[in-house]
A protein has these predicted regions:
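Hydrophobic/aromatic beta-strand patches that form the interior of the parallel beta-sheet core
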Residues: 41-43, 84, 112, 132, ...
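Short glycine-rich anion-binding loops that position phosphate/pyrophosphate groups of nucleotides
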Residues: 24, 116-119, 182, 276-278
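Short glycine-enriched, charge-decorated loop/helix-capping segments at active-site entrances
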Residues: 55-63, 128-132, 222, 286-289, ...
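FAD-site-proximal beta/loop scaffold in flavoenzymes
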Residues: 129-159, 252-253, 263-335
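A Rossmann-like FAD-binding core segment of flavoenzymes
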Residues: 79, 83-90, 186-302, 353
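FAD-binding core/adjacent interface of flavoenzyme oxidoreductases
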Residues: 1-13, 81-168, 260, 271
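C-terminal, flexible cofactor-proximal segment of oxidoreductases
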Residues: 2-4, 332, 336-424
Length: 424
C-alpha cells in the first residue's frame, strides 16, 4: 500500500476529479472550491442536477422543473470548477486515470466516486420493457403523459374491463419510493380524471410488495403505521398486496405469485420503484471482493477512503461504511460530500483525514399532495401540511440554487421547530 506521505504532501498539479454530480459529488465539488484553489473537474453524463426527493412535487406541479433540476453550467458559473459532460467508461486506479466513452482521459490527484446507482429489474421478464421508472425529470414527464393518456382513453371506451385496466396503476415495490408514489398518485389522478368527466372511485392503485410488510427497512414502526393509515385516507384508497412476488410484466398485465398461486393483475400502468444496482463502472473496478458488500457496493473506511487507494474517496449510493452504515438518502450524501472535501483538503495539507460524521434530522416521507410525514430525531412525528412544509424547507435548504431564497424565508421556521422539539 502506498503511503499517505508519498501521495498527499507533493505539490501535484493534477486535478481533483469528481465522478457523478448527485448530492455527494456536487457538494464535494462545491465544498472543495471553498477549501482548495487547485483544479477541480466534475464529470456527469447529464447537463442537469436532479433533486430526486422532489420529483413527486414535479409530477404534481407543486414545484417547477428549474427549481429541482438546474443545469450544472449555471450552478458552477464563476466557481472555477470545470464541468465535463460525459459518460465514464473506465477507471484505472493504479495509473490514476479516468477514461470517458468519448475517448477523453483525465489523470487525477484525488478521485471522488459518486456515480450513484442504476435501476435493477431483478431479471424479471418484461420489467425493463413495460414498467415505467422514476429517477429523472424525463421519467416524471413520461409518467405524467402516460397517465393522462390512459385517463383520457378510459373516458372514451365502452368496454368495462378495458376501462378498469386503464384506470389501474400497479406499483412494484413497497419501500419508501413505492409508498410515496402510491400516495402521490392517489391524490393526483382524481384531479386529472374528474375534469374529464370520470369517476375517481373507478381509479385503482395497488402496491405489490414481495415482503410481509411495507417500509420494512426504511422507517420506524410508528411511521410505518402512519403511512399505512395515510394510504387508506387518500382521495383514492391504495391497495397493498403483501407477499406478492412479481414474476413477469406483459403489456397491460402484471403476473405475480401469492400464497403459491400465480395471479394476474390487468394494469395499463406499471411503475417500478424497487431494485437498485451499482453503476457498471463501479462493478468493473479492480477492487478485491472482500472490499465490497453483497450488493457490490464499495466498502470504505470511516474517512470514506477506499482501503487500498487512500487518494480515492467514495460516497452516496455506490459506497457503504460497514461499521456505520447509513441510509441512501439526500441528507446522508450531502454530508458525505462535505466530509470528503474536508478530508481531501487535509491530505493536501499533509494532515490525517478524520471519520465522516452524519447527523440525520429524521425521516421525511411524502404521503400525498401537499402532505408529508416527518419523524424527527426518531422521537417526534409531524404530519399533514405542516409535515410537508418541514420536508420542503429541509430539502430546499440543500439546494445550491435560487431555492435558497425560499429557505431564507422559511428555513428559520424549520430550524426553530427542530430546536423547540429538541428541548422537550
Amino acid at each position: 500500500m502506498r503511503s499517505l506521505a508519498h501521495i498527499d504532501q507533493t505539490n501535484d498539479p493534477l486535478p481533483i476529479v469528481i465522478l457523478g454530480g448527485g448530492f455527494a459529488g456536487l457538494f464535494a465539488a462545491l465544498h472543495l472550491r471553498d477549501l482548495h484553489s487547485g483544479p477541480i473537474i466534475l464529470i456527469d453524463q447529464s447537463w442537469s442536477f436532479v433533486f430526486k426527493p422532489l420529483l413527486y412535487e414535479l409530477l404534481t406541479s407543486e414545484v417547477k422543473l428549474e427549481l429541482i433540476s438546474p443545469r450544472y453550467d449555471e450552478l458552477l458559473h464563476n466557481s472555477g470548477i470545470t464541468f465535463v459532460l460525459g459518460t465514464v467508461e473506465a477507471i484505472d486506479l493504479e495509473q490514476k486515470q479516468v477514461k470517458l466513452n468519448s475517448g477523453l482521459k483525465y489523470s487525477y490527484r484525488h478521485l471522488v466516486l459518486a456515480l450513484g446507482s442504476t435501476t435493477s429489474y431483478l431479471g424479471i421478464p418484461g420489467a425493463k420493457e413495460h414498467a415505467l421508472s422514476f429517477r429523472t425529470g424525463y421519467d416524471v414527464f413520461a409518467l405524467g403523459q402516460h397517465l393522462r393518456n390512459r385517463l383520457q382513453i378510459a373516458t372514451q371506451t365502452e368496454d368495462i374491463e378495458e376501462r378498469r385496466a386503464l384506470l389501474t396503476v400497479a406499483i412494484v415495490g413497497g419501500g419508501a419510493s413505492g409508498v410515496e408514489m402510491a400516495a402521490t398518485l392517489a391524490d393526483l389522478l382524481p384531479t386529472w380524471y374528474i375534469p374529464l368527466g370520470g369517476n375517481p372511485q373507478d381509479i385503482q392503485i395497488v402496491i405489490l410488495q414481495r415482503g410481509s410488510e411495507i417500509l420494512k427497512e426504511s422507517t420506524s414502526d410508528r411511521l410505518r403505521e402512519t403511512a399505512q393509515l395515510e394510504l387508506q385516507q387518500r382521495t383514492v384508497s391504495v391497495g397493498v398486496l403483501l407477499e406478492s412476488e412479481v414474476k413477469a410484466i406483459h403489456p397491460g398485465v402484471v403476473e405475480f405469485e401469492r400464497s403459491g398461486q400465480l395471479e394476474r393483475l390487468a394494469a395499463a400502468t406499471v411503475v417500478w420503484t424497487t431494485g437498485n444496482a451499482t453503476h457498471p463502472v463501479i462493478d468493473s473496478l479492480a477492487i478485491a471482493p472482500e472490499n465490497r458488500d453483497k450488493h457490490k457496493r464499495l466498502l470504505v473506511k470511516p474517512t470514506l477512503q477506499l482501503p487500498d487507494f487512500p487518494e480515492v474517496f467514495a460516497g452516496g449510493d455506490c459506497a457503504i461504511e460497514p461499521l456505520n452504515p447509513q441510509p441512501a438518502t439526500a441528507q446522508v450524501a450531502y454530508q458525505q460530500g462535505a466530509a470528503i472535501a474536508h478530508n481531501i483538503k487535509a491530505l493536501i495539507n499533509g494532515k490525517s483525514p478524520t471519520p465522516a460524521t452524519v447527523n440525520l434530522r429524521g425521516t421525511l416521507m411524502k404521503l400525498g399532495m401537499h402532505e408529508s410525514a416527518v419523524e424527527i430525531f426518531d422521537r417526534y412525528e409531524i404530519k399533514g401540511q405542516l409535515g410537508q412544509a418541514i420536508r420542503l424547507a429541509t430539502y430546499l435548504e440543500l439546494m445550491p440554487t435560487p431555492a435558497r431564497n425560499f429557505v431564507n424565508r422559511t428555513g428559520w421556521f424549520t430550524e426553530e421547530i427542530l430546536k423547540q422539539i429538541a428541548r422537550v
